[in-house]
Amino acid sequence: MHGRKDDAQKQPVKNQLGLNPQSHLPELQLFQAEGKIYKYDHMEKSVNSSSLVSPPQRISSTVKTHISHTYECNFVDSLFTQKEKANIGTEHYKCSERGKAFHQGLHFTIHQIIHTKETQFKCDICGKIFNKKSNLASHQRIHTGEKPYKCNECGKVFHNMSHLAQHRRIHTGEKPYKCNECGKVFNQISHLAQHQRIHTGEKPYKCNECGKVFHQISHLAQHRTIHTGEKPYECNKCGKVFSRNSYLVQHLIIHTGEKPYRCNVCGKVFHHISHLAQHQRIHTGEKPYKCNECGKVFSHKSSLVNHWRIHTGEKPYKCNECGKVFSHKSSLVNHWRIHTGEKPYKCNECGKVFSRNSYLAQHLIIHAGEKPYKCDECDKAFSQNSHLVQHHRIHTGEKPYKCDECGKVFSQNSYLAYHWRIHTGEKAYKCNECGKVFGLNSSLAHHRKIHTGEKPFKCNECGKAFSMRSSLTNHHAIHTGEKHFKCNECGKLFRDNSYLVRHQRFHAGKKSNTCN
């Protein structure tokens, strides 16, 4: 008895259903094709009728191909035993052609295909095949460029009604697809599927070039452009090219000035919905991106990616001019301006231009008079933290920069660079006005003010202006009475470094006379 049962289970589905392999070939092919998806009731059916959202749409093209159109309704009858018919109970699916009713969605779908005798519709352009004429018509709009479906909110047009429906959720805020793991909601089911890979850790898309793996195929496609250097997306306005279409779309808004996305909390507007989403985390305090290595959390995914390179040491961005590599794209962009000489950031106060926005921000503090960085030793304040760090070495005596040629040490890297030119004799910076050459760019910049008469550093006390910041600092000591410069020999204090230098010559002269 058990042996027969085992034998029966080893039989293909077609034999268990009582069909003859020779006389019912189309039917057998049908169940063979669907064997991986649907199992018969007596074989622990894996997909029940309630999971079929729309049975006629769930049947595969393989099934449609293999069902013989010559079989009448009694074909489906032959698939069920009398016992099964008795157990059907409520009949959920009814055929509109003949009124025949079915309990299971799959059986109803099979029956419908026999009636409709569906034809395959082929695209003349690319050869793609569709089971419905409407699907073919929708597909052909890709080739023709026709976009008949328009959004009433923003005027954006689409090939398909389904794409318009998805787009509308941006305006309505509807997010019907929820992650069972973390409760996050999405406006598209594909976005939910992609998101769920974060929880599962699944990265099915691998780069053949470097072996890096990705959650999404779009991320792999974007990554590949790093290896190829391809930038297929060009701006029609200014000719700038981009590796990703999303970058081009973002760039185009610069020309239009459009900011359609508004924060409901503070009213701030943004060019892109992604920027709005990132901004809103300021209000919520949400930091959903966590580093698996050290546990640090971030509000933006890009911040996590940048942080992760601290652990990996990865530097994927290479300068084509000099070969220098960088961990961040922004660092490469900033570096590239050394070669191009581009300075896109301009001060509205004095017109001075800078290669980096951070340099402009530092410069603006000069005009504001703000000095937020204060020395704990002498209470001297600075507009930049780097200046405070450099100043603090006066108190500590630290000189971390050493000349490899003569062993002399310096408190600042710029001093070492200046000193190094004594050994090389290099004077790379030339004044276009008088031809004088300088070892440092800063020295040339100071010198140029002789020709221009520029005095950007103004005293808030008396209004006197200076061409150099150090001159203003020294002058300011007249008003405050401060004396920061101390003689190590006798402890005498001076408000100007030049006075200290002169004074130290007095000690040097005394020592010389003593020796004599």
Curated annotation (Swiss-Prot):
Gene3D superfamilies attached to this UniProt entry: Classic Zinc Finger
Keywords for this protein: DNA-binding, Metal-binding, Nucleus, Repeat, Transcription, Transcription regulation, Zinc, Zinc-finger
Subcellular location: Nucleus
InterPro entries: Znf_C2H2_sf (IPR036236), Znf_C2H2_type (IPR013087)
Chain intervals for the UniProt region annotation (Disordered): 1-20
Residue stretches spanning the membrane: none
Any GO MF annotation of the entry: DNA-binding transcription factor activity, RNA polymerase II-specific
Entry-linked Pfam families: zf-C2H2
Location, primary (coarse class): nucleus
Source taxon at top rank: Eukaryota
Cellular component aspect of the GO annotation: nucleus
GO BP annotations, alphabetical order: regulation of transcription by RNA polymerase II
Functional description taken from the UniProt entry: May be involved in transcriptional regulation.
UniProt family annotation: Belongs to the krueppel C2H2-type zinc-finger protein family.
Protein name, UniProt field: Zinc finger protein 83
Name of the gene: ZNF83
